[in-house]
């Protein structure tokens, strides 16, 4: 599954933000300190997000059984083509270091490495410059 935000679509609509908040409330019930940590990550994402128009790969998820089959490429190819046609950059965030080489294959480079929670995983922002 890919969730792509077109230019001008960020920040996300209120309905999407409420769905994210619902996930944070569930985290708080299960682990109260998790809410504060989640809030720090969300604030870091908001602060780091570029303000100029670009294509935003908000989410890319492939079932482990379907990984390494080209599905992830196909899921994001339409966005990459649209960005190229528009002459705009693409942007994403990841917390998984193993994703960095994957996204580099598509022309993304690490823009920033953030540590919203000192004891938590880093958050990398990546950008693919207009092609």
Model-derived features: where do they sit?
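A structural microfeature
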Residues: 1-2, 112
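Conserved acyl-donor/pantetheine-binding loop and adjacent beta-alpha core of acyl/acetyltransferases
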Residues: 3-61, 67, 117-118
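Hydrophobic, well-ordered beta-alpha structural blocks that scaffold small-molecule cofactor pockets
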Residues: 39-47, 78, 82, 105
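Conserved GNAT acetyl-CoA-binding A-motif
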Residues: 53-55, 82-95
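Long, positively charged, glycine-interspersed low-complexity recognition regions
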Residues: 53-55, 108-131
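Conserved beta-strand-loop-alpha-helix junction that forms the acyl-donor binding cleft
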Residues: 58-67, 91-100, 118-119, 128-130
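Conserved acetyl-CoA-binding loop-helix of GNAT-fold acetyltransferases
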Residues: 62, 68-81, 105
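Conserved active-site alpha-helix within GNAT-family acetyltransferase domains
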Residues: 73, 85-87, 96-113, 119
């Amino acid at each position: 599954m890919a969730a792509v935000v077109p230019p001008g679509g960020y920040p996300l609509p209120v309905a999407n933000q409420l769905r994210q908040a619902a996930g944070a409330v569930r985290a708080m019930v299960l682990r109260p300190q998790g809410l504060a940590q989640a809030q720090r990550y969300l604030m870091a994402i908001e602060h780091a997000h570029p303000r100029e128009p670009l294509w935003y790969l908000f989410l890319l998820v492939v079932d482990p059984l379907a990984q390494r089959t080209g599905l992830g490429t196909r899921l994001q190819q339409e966005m990459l083509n649209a960005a190229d046609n528009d002459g705009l950059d693409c942007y994403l965030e990841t917390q998984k270091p193993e994703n960095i080489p994957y996204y580099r294959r598509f022309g993304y480079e690490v823009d920033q490495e953030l540590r919203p929670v000192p004891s938590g995983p880093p958050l990398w922002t990546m950008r693919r410059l207009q092609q």
